[in-house]
Amino acid sequence: MLFRSVDGAQNAASAAVLKSAIRSIFKYKKLILVFGVSKDKDIKGMVNQLLPLAHKIILTRADNPRAAIPIYLKKYFAAKGKEIFITASVKEAKVLVLRIADSQDLVLVTGSLFVVGEFKDAYR
């Protein structure tokens, strides 16, 4: 069974609460972070909170004009030595998750309620 957690954390403070909750509630082998965010959010602050949890990172964007471009997001993650994937859509991110995650991994989808909603709706 692949575990999945979705959360609409969209600033550093809510990302810190999310990080604490993940650490206290879930047990997993690896955490795969699916991250997409609006370009007007505190991206650096969110990344600083969530990056320590992640083993693999999938950067994506919601179908929303305010969404940050995934290749732009990569600069916040790139120097940290994590495996990073870039997808053009949330649907593509979900396909990738299903390919790379195993039964002991936790998939965390966060950064934007738009991303969370699209992830939940993809291929229902």
Protein language model features and the residues they cover:
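Active-site-adjacent alpha-helix immediately C-terminal to a catalytic or transition-state-stabilizing loop
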Residues: 117-124
